[in-house]
């Protein structure tokens, strides 16, 4: 296994199976963040992740963190909060503000560089990247964004400025995504936050098999039309 240097003249990627074991999943470096290359990456279970000043690094970790949306873990406290929630949730209303929120809301620094922001804004303009917004009155208090691959959604980042705002974004999106045929959410690497919401780890090979099948199952185009999302109170 060796780290592959990508060419700017080809958007091809090496097989994810050739990724390094340490650091886990590092596959390649270089290339660019053009829409064509980013889409090629997501189609093959690969994503960019690098710090400011570093070369572009491409990853496909093993195991892979995923969330089956119908298995979102709704804790008792979160259920009580949601039933009296002061929030309103929307889809694709404010992509630029959501990615800004994700970039600026990490105390330890951010991997969302200016180049990353510009690249994903372009994907959004092309209809491939999407945002979920959480509002309190007219204030944006949380949200998340990611890239659609048919019935699979690749979550990229989320942020929260008020209590349970990012959890609310994921909860409401999971319900809406499931109702319209969505099957799986890619969480990339498991952390305590996503694990508490029901994310699990599966072998990379299994993730790639799910991706190959689900990306061939497009949701209705109207699913991504900007609108308010609702989740019935229980």
Swiss-Prot record:
The keyword Membrane does not apply. The keyword Metal-binding does not apply. Keywords: Acyltransferase, Cytoplasm, Transferase. One of its GO terms (biological process) is protein catabolic process. GO terms for molecular function: leucyl-tRNA--protein transferase activity. It is found in: Cytoplasm. This is Leucyl/phenylalanyl-tRNA--protein transferase. It comes from Salmonella typhimurium (strain LT2 / SGSC1412 / ATCC 700720).
